[in-house]
Amino acid sequence: MKDSFTVALIGLGNRGKDAYLPEFLKYGGKVRVTAIAEPVDEKRNEVAKLLGLAPEQCFRTGEELLAGPRLADAAVIATMDRQHVPQAVPALQKGYDLLLEKPVSPSLEECDLLARVARETGRRVVVCHVLRYTAFYKKVKELLDGGAVGQVMTVQAIENVGYWHQSHSFVRGNWRRTDESSPMLLQKCCHDLDLYLWLAGKSAKRVSSFGSNSFFNAAHAPKGAAARCLDGCAAKADCPFDAEKIYLTNAATGIDAGNDGWPCEVLAAHPAHDSVLDAIRTGPYGRCVFACDNDVVDHQVVNVEMTDGSTFGFTMTGFTEHNTRFARFFGTAGELSADLLSGDITLTPFGKPAQVFHIDAAEGHSGGDAGLVKAFVELMLGGEPGSGLTSLDVSLESHRIALAAEKSRLAGGAAVELQ
């Protein structure tokens, strides 16, 4: 066992700076951040000051950081989807172990390339499929593995993206276009697909899918809608997607309600009423949701046939009040429902009373962010990798399913065989 290790952070956005860095700092001297890369000067300078880094430890891009000698034992790659593999390959070749943000890549060829380089270099890659690391889903796994419902025959699951999250990230935000990021099912739900395969202990054989961007387009703009929410929009009062409501006044998401975290921290490095208002006035997050250049889906369904003949139905939709997940597992001896919003896991053995297990939610993907970093720290310090560790090889099946589903969707729902 090692006493400590060093890490380089590539990408200081919502995941790198706001999710993972605070978790690493909880480990004190066991984890030291020795290099950072971030193109936004304000973010880079702020983190450099926090960590006491010298100028030669700070870079504008991951490419600049990786061009020189190795600066840490491990690297966290938390950049945009299409940057992951072009940065991860040279990082592995330089000798870094990796904590890699999802998705690995929208290209299966790149996924396979990265897996090959990881094998050739003998380096470790952990993919940020954070849901496996929550106490909630670990309990679901314990019950299912213990035979609580018998053999799982059918899984039904839904990701409630949330109306404001859909508009924030996938209509106005960085993940609104497939050509700039990846298909929405891959970017948003690859860790859901990974989760349910792991929970049920299954592998996929065949996939079909339907979905589209049916609503967030010009055809659905209400009468009197303006190009920007602050440009005298006549539909503003009745529009739930109004940027002022989401970022200023909404009780759950608005800065005026005291929410200076996500999503407001995406609009301004130090969110306050004036800085958020200015971002709405001048930036992409103030655009009308019916006048953006988005092309990713706003809803999608996926049907999966497993290799053992069991089935999995998954729905992703942006048309929900809450941002949460719900699943049901139907087995030969009972059924189990998992409601992440309430924290309740309800087990109903056939012919017997139901049992309810309550798991209190935690911050950061219900505690998944903290659990992921803990598992990575333990791995880097020399501990044994846990059975739920989301290694690269394990994680790629979810990517194959997501990309097969996108292929099916674009082909009108035709079934796609998985190799």
Where are each of the predicted segments found?
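Rossmann-fold dehydrogenase core element
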Residues: 113-130, 150-157
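Short, Asp-centered acidic motifs that coordinate Mg2+ and/or phosphate
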Residues: 35, 74, 154
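C-terminal helical cap and adjacent loop that interface with cofactors, partners, or active-site loops
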Residues: 51, 295-419
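Glycine-centered short loops/turns at secondary-structure junctions
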Residues: 95, 122, 147, 309, ...
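C-terminal capping/lid region of NAD(P)-dependent oxidoreductase domains
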Residues: 2, 123, 150-154, 407-419
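Predominantly a Rossmann-like dinucleotide-binding segment in NAD(P)-dependent oxidoreductases
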Residues: 131-285, 412
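Beta-loop-alpha module in the N-terminal Rossmann-like domain of NAD(P)-dependent dehydrogenases
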Residues: 53-117
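N-terminal Rossmann-like dinucleotide-binding module
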Residues: 1-53
